[in-house]
């Protein structure tokens, strides 16, 4: 943008905050919750004083997607929005950093899930499958072709909010299930070696 006094000659300024605000509206329109593709503006900062047209502003955007193809498409769409100036004379610089690849099903994932379901039944523990936009180190493991299931820890909810909670009662049963699955995997590995 370009700084200018907000009271004396605001027309000479180019407001970087307004530029981001206009881009945010377009970025928000990219959300496709059914598909699992989301764009979240996590932080925004700009300007130096209320009486000065903001010369600069910055924001952090979080992108989530379920497949690599959806991720590539979403990144292209975001890039197109960022590269288009909404206010004449304002320039946008951006950097993409990848945090985690999407958690994908690989060969062996279905068999691993069946083991978890069987252990849940044997122990009388409810087992529900769900697709979320959450991530873990498991995303990296799945990305290299290792069967991975995420979300087997204790029950909780309202993540990243003041109301976030954890059900302590669920920890024992979840540990038991994990122990059962790991034990079965060990037995399968022993059978495979003999």
Residue ranges and their predicted role:
Residues 2-194:
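Metal-dependent amide/peptide-bond hydrolase catalytic core
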């Amino acid at each position: 943008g370009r700084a200018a006094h907000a009271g004396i000659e605001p027309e000479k300024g180019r407001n970087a905050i307004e530029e981001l605000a206009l881009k945010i509206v377009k970025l928000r329109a990219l959300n496709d919750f059914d598909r699992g593709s989301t764009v979240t503006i996590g932080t925004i900062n700009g300007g130096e004083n209320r009486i000065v047209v903001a010369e600069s502003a910055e924001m952090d955007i979080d992108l989530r997607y379920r497949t690599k193809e959806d991720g590539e498409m979403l990144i292209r769409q975001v890039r197109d929005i960022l590269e288009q100036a909404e206010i004449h004379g304002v320039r946008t610089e951006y950097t993409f950093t990848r945090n985690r690849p999407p958690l994908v099903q690989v060969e062996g994932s279905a068999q691993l899930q069946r083991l978890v379901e069987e252990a849940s039944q044997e122990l009388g523990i409810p087992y529900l499958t769900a697709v979320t936009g959450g991530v873990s180190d498991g995303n990296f493991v799945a990305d290299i072709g290792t069967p991975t299931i995420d979300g087997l820890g204790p029950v909780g909810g309202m993540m990243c909010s003041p109301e976030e909670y954890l059900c302590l009662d669920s920890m024992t049963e979840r540990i038991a299930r994990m122990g059962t699955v790991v034990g079965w995997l060990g037995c399968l590995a022993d059978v495979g070696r003999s």
